[in-house]
């Protein structure tokens, strides 16, 4: 599945949105939006007054009252349609996800062995902890962890990426997702979720927004809008007795009608942002999905907009991530070939790019052929985040390679001595931005393998943009401080954490949060889970482990760590859109005030005609023009609410100034022009 962004006013979406907008006229739906609920009540009230005029139960202009009632209903419908369009785009995305989810069968195993007895069962009957065998051509029946085997898996149904990926037991690529398909070989998988709780089920629920809760900022803004609505409601309510008293005192004009007061109230309360607020939130999650990122809630998207510290893994995010062995640097008393032989032996079972490159370099330099570890009766020691080294035990030899501090501890624990000359070699490699990998055999240090990595093109400029926005970037790496400092300087990050362990990451996040900062990070391994759970915005890689995906509040389907920067941009754009439209909505009130107040009270107080600076044709056309503009502006702003305002990297103060000029001044001027044009049209049509 590819998450292609659909056109905002695509005919099928518009038709569905129109039907949904009418369905949302149900009062049980309307009361959830307090601002628009006031407009909804005003629509019913003016409609009843219009019917009373038609039936002769009261006096007044049926044409004027009916027109006001009609446009108030349009205001409610347009607000409903904005939300329905946003939800419609999400529902279309959910429908394509449902197409991926289909009934399949599973080979349930009694034990975690490929040759264990198996039973054919429906995938829907599988429970957490069940074991299944998945062979070439089979659909993965559940989300789970690979316990045995390795296979090529087609994940295009979930990620949109056509290239197959390798899933195998152990390491950070042991997670499989229900709905994907095994292309070759076999896997023994333990199911980690029950039916209805799979990643695909959660994706569908998230993008549908069926259980969308308001975010903290959305709640705060709603409280502000409700407060403004109450203030304007009280102010409008006092105008009726004031009008009656004024008419009696001056013996001129007539009291303001309920219809005019309702029109005034609707034009003064912040209906523009009130009608678009929900659509902005839904569209934010939809834009995140368009970037192939699944957010667990709008709360996560909003938090991304408030982030001011990014923790970025060096490998794959800042550098290309394909570090290659470039040189063997032997310790005193050791030949380069001896070092190459030991380094190659320790890397024969190492499937990392670094390990494979060491094997290749040893072949190229000294014609050292690969050896079969099984025939040598060798035991491979895999790398772990805790030991920060790997190696091999072969016959009487105990070879280890890893970070300088890890090898130092290993050598000293074996009563060995770490030569100062090797420290010099390590510093020399690190100063040039390379990564020194120290090799030792038993208690003897053999030397250093220099690994070279390349900083991604354009990454320095992206970090400069983030700095303009007030976001601090911190590089996380397992390299020593010298290497980390060299790469950090080249990439242009603000700070770095060298020789990082899972505990150090967690401590750093807590330190920043204690300072009142919001932290974002990415991760893919089980060892990243505690830090992901602690971070305010935690983007787990889809290729990572189940534990990492459960700990994060977002999942990147492309498994691209650099995506974190784009996630922050989308979050900030959503917050900016909400703020910009709020500014525009409140600024709108000024022009409507100049339109309606003179029209309502000039007959009693002729001096108020001085406020009719737009020279509107008549009181009725002035009021109707303001109400029509109030409804139409929602329609014109729907594309902006769904797409988001244009985003540029700059400081918060500069952004505020820019948006005040565009949306504050625009909100003041546009209604003057719009209301005057509508008044001219109504006059030309003899409706004023």
UniProtKB/Swiss-Prot annotation:
Pfam families: E1-E2_ATPase (PF00122), Hydrolase (PF00702). It comes from the Bacteria. Keywords: ATP-binding, Cell inner membrane, Cell membrane, Ion transport, Magnesium, Membrane, Metal-binding, Nucleotide-binding, Phosphoprotein, Potassium, Potassium transport, Translocase, Transmembrane, Transmembrane helix, Transport. One of its GO terms (molecular function) is P-type potassium transmembrane transporter activity. The chain crosses the membrane at residues 34-54, 62-82, 219-239, 260-280, 594-614, 622-642, 662-682. It catalyses: K(+)(out) + ATP + H2O = K(+)(in) + ADP + phosphate + H(+). It is an enzyme of class 7 (translocase). InterPro entries: ATPase_P-typ_cyto_dom_N, ATPase_P-typ_P_site, ATPase_P-typ_TM_dom_sf, ATPase_P-typ_transduc_dom_A_sf, HAD-like_sf, HAD_sf, P-type_ATPase_bsu_IA, P_typ_ATPase. It is found in: Cell inner membrane. Its main location: membrane. ATP binds at residues 350, 354, 383-390, 401. Mg(2+) binds at residues 524, 528. Belongs to the cation transport ATPase (P-type) (TC 3.A.3) family. Type IA subfamily. Part of the high-affinity ATP-driven potassium transport (or Kdp) system, which catalyzes the hydrolysis of ATP coupled with the electrogenic transport of potassium into the cytoplasm. This subunit is responsible for energy coupling to the transport system and for the release of the potassium ions to the cytoplasm. This is Potassium-transporting ATPase ATP-binding subunit. It comes from Yersinia pseudotuberculosis serotype O:1b (strain IP 31758). The lineage of its organism: Bacteria, Pseudomonadati, Pseudomonadota, Gammaproteobacteria, Enterobacterales.
